[in-house]
A protein has these predicted regions:
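Acidic/polar surface patches and capping/hinge elements
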Residues: 21-443
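Bacterial Sec-dependent N-terminal signal peptides
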Residues: 1-28
Length: 443
């Protein structure tokens, strides 16, 4: 009897050892697996012609889903008490074979698939990802358990997203052009309606409100040739076309990132495939994580922080754009100086002040500098697939500064919108970094 009991106990111990060994020996995912989800999201955004503010919203909630999985596994700080109105997510009973890395990636896929209009494409990308997971050794039992938990977390994050007020925007009245001399007007060649005029009503993630960092007022509109505004007008007119150096043209085109760009083809307008400025900076984040050999958890964290910064930066920026409703250089120059003038870049379909590239690029640079330092050298080849040659940078700040001034050379922004946009970007970026660093969440 005693020998039988010893035999049974030995068998149980052996089984436990084997199961623990299986759990320890599970394959490991890397920063590239996280970055691939973001890259596939960007592909779908290009397909859907997703506007820049909305793209930032998709990135933020998708990254949050992956982040929440890792936070509940105690590998990252909880966002409860840090993000505005972030819910307490009740515990879920997950199978002991659940893998947090695998579940985090699948939570991102699940969330993106539900958020994006062509989300079914994300489902196909997820299938390919799971095939690769089986190849490296994940069992179907581990995959099924991890996917179940991923769906649980994704559902909670989607509920949080649903409550941010974006869905109410479709019920708001159609935006009406003011038709005053200095106000924004539709621009050629497509004369598109204004993009997301009510995005400032969306709940912010970290900052207190859309109006927390209101910039200085833009230089007042005036047709007086001695006025500050007219001097801005002349400056934009004089720094265009043949007066731009080839390097200035290269920089402007490198940072164009205009999903709405079209080209004339006879009587038709053909859409050009371009990513949003936020997608570009998420691509830079992937480069930084890969080059620094960041671990899986850190990669999830950095992507989430950059995405949070992008969304809050766009909310701030859009508050200023539609509050000031300022005329674009293209409209003003054609109206008051040269009716045949064209900027190097196509003018995006929303008001001029404040410069979105300046705000969101600086915000992203501040956050990335927090994680990787202020002398991080890298080659930006994010848009090489679209025929844009790579550029080398010595820091994220250098890249953000270049992105900002590119809008002046492109002929779509006045200088005060750029300078004040940079300042606003610093404020948002520092707020995100400081709020998360001193947040109440526990690791």
């Amino acid at each position: 009897m005693k020998r039988n009991l010893i035999t049974i106990l030995s068998a149980i111990c052996l089984l436990l050892v084997v199961r623990c060994a299986e759990k320890r020996q599970q394959p490991v995912l890397t920063n590239k697996d996280v970055s691939k989800v973001i890259a596939r999201m960007t592909d779908v955004m290009v397909h859907d012609v997703t506007n820049p503010p909305l793209a930032s919203r998709f990135f933020a909630y998708t990254c949050l889903a992956g982040y929440e999985v890792m936070a509940r596994d105690k590998q990252l700080k909880s966002m409860q008490g840090i993000l505005n109105q972030y819910p307490a997510i009740s515990a879920s009973k997950q199978n002991e074979l659940y893998n947090p890395q695998l579940s985090a990636v699948m939570a991102m896929f699940e969330t993106a698939a539900k958020l994006q209009p062509s989300g079914s494409l994300m489902g196909k990308y997820e299938e390919g990802f799971l095939d690769s997971c089986r190849t490296i050794g994940f069992t179907d039992e581990v995959i099924d358990s991890s996917k179940s938990y991923a769906k649980f977390i994704s559902k909670k994050i989607l509920a949080y997203a649903k409550a941010d007020g974006y869905r109410k925007i479709s019920n708001y009245p159609r935006y009406k052009l003011k038709r005053t001399p200095g106000s924004w007007d539709l621009t050629p060649p497509a004369y598109m309606v204004p993009v997301e005029p009510y995005f400032n009503t969306v709940r912010t993630l970290v900052i207190d409100s859309a109006s927390q960092f209101v910039p200085d007022a833009p230089v007042p509109f005036s047709t007086d040739k001695n006025s500050a505004f007219y001097k801005f007008l002349e400056l934009s007119y004089s720094k265009s076309g043949d007066k731009l150096t080839q390097e200035e043209k290269n920089i402007a085109n490198f940072w164009d990132c205009n999903p709405f760009a079209v080209q004339n083809d006879g009587h038709m307008l053909i859409g050009l495939k371009k990513i949003s400025p936020g997608a570009h900076w998420m691509g830079v984040t992937a480069i930084a994580c890969s080059q620094s050999q960041a671990g899986f958890a850190k990669t999830i964290e950095v992507n989430t922080m950059v995405a949070i910064g992008l969304m809050d930066a766009f909310i701030c920026c859009w508050e200023d754009k539609y509050r000031t409703d300022r005329i674009r250089p293209e409209t003003a120059i054609r109206r008051y100086i040269d009716p045949h003038w064209k900027p190097l870049l196509q003018t995006p379909p929303f008001p001029e002040y404040i410069s979105g590239h300046s705000v969101i690029s600086t915000t992203s640079a501040v956050i990335l500098t927090h994680y990787f330092g202020n002398s991080f050298k890298y080659i930006d080849d994010v848009e090489q697939q679209f025929g844009v040659p790579p550029r080398q940078f010595n820091s994220f700040t250098q890249a953000a500064t270049e992105a900002a001034i590119s809008r002046f050379w492109g002929g779509i922004h006045f200088m005060d919108a750029i300078d004040n946009g940079i300042l606003q970007g610093y404020r948002v970026g520092n707020w995100v970094v400081n709020k998360v660093s001193r947040g109440k969440g526990s690791k």
